[in-house]
């Protein structure tokens, strides 16, 4: 009997040691399924077959610290969010806005940066909106599943400023911007981070900007233990290191 108790205690002790050596959470000790949309520079994009970006650097730093590995799957924007809701993915990141409708079906990390929403147009069109009174005269495009649609539904449409049926939806920013250049759409909604990149590549300009209404975070399935540990990591590296990563990609 004593031998059985000893062996049971020994097994329990070994299990506790093994668990402690797995990382700071069970989730962090295994391969993490990551959903992304690799057409959202500078937050997430592909270059020469390699995944890069601000969000990637933040989560890569987490995995290096915790000893986990990422298995990255690319989706369109709506598919990426769907992978989190259905729990096919453990986390999603590509410059994702934290919104109330999304918080009902997924959990978010603490915000890691503030963001603006920019309506951009081609410079040769010279569309400049002093206010939103004339917005209804233009077609607007953006990727399916973006927070802009909720904004139009809850803020603009009830005030008679813009209707959701005027919107043209696309798989990603790439297709929306192609139609913008071809004159198939008047303006495209871009995150401020994304707009900062495409201004260097395309002759676009801001037609209207919403400041202070958006914060970006990492998306997790409801009840995720990984989210809490990632938040802990963000606290551990502190605001200065987080800002250094942001500054690296926002140059």
Per-range role (PLM):
Residues 65, 73-74, 78-91, 105-107, ...:
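Short helices/loops that flank or line small-molecule/ion binding pockets
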Residues 27-96, 169:
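Extracytoplasmic small-molecule ligand-binding "clamshell" domains
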Residues 56-65, 123-147, 217-251:
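Extended ligand-binding regions for polar small-molecule ligands
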